[in-house]
Amino acid sequence: MSLNLLGDGYVETIDNRDIEQNVLQQGQAHLGIAGVAVRAPLLEGSASQPTTQVGRFGWKSQHTSLMSSCADSLRNELGIRNRLYPDEYPTLAATDGPTPFDTPDAKTHMTELERLVAEIRQTSPPARDANLAVSADAQAGEKLFAQIGCAICHVSTYKTVKPGTRINGGTYKVPKFLGNQVIHPYSDFLLHDVGTGDGIPQAAEPEYLDQSTANKFRTAPLWGLRFRQDLMHDGNSPGTEAAIARHGGEATKVRQRYDHLTPAEKHQLQQFLKSL
């Protein structure tokens, strides 16, 4: 399944420490939830800067920056080479493949890859349904969402770093419109085993492949949920009820709490989810 990109510029500016803090808080919940913070390579970083940061993009948090993530998608999903992924596939003998996205524009002096990333950083997070969000049922459902433990992984709120902060190994200066912003992505950006694993580890570069994460997935951000019908990584859950039913593994105890809600309480929680 394709991933939502709207608002990812804000996700990029979440402090690494805030994501790592989620690991500690989950351990304190004593529900068998044990998220993993992935160390992902910063492909655009220089040799003099730290080479890894906390991953947050991709189904397995295999990327830590939008530049790295977009470069990977161009190369491995569209077959378009670029400066971060300059090579052809070893199995292909082509020497005249697609031109890398690295030719600066005469006016902006930005490459196509840089313009693509800049465009994604400009996007706003999906807005909630304003009317449904203030309804009594949705507000009650939001409280239930937290009470039964859904919010342990689907963390609602972060504040982005200050404007002017240099992130991504110093390669990116956070602009004013992204800095000091309170956002509500509803994700911890950690990897979890909820029983739906595909057995495929993913990493930005082969040396970072970790077989222990093969059956784990990043907690899917829930903002914009109301615009999607086919859920989970494989799209095999037609709606939120079906997606909740597939939450096993680390999420088993929380799912059981949902199962024990009354029909009225389940309706309230579903109304909250429909407002996102």
Positions of the model-derived regions?
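Periplasmic c-type cytochrome electron-transfer domains
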Residues: M1-L276
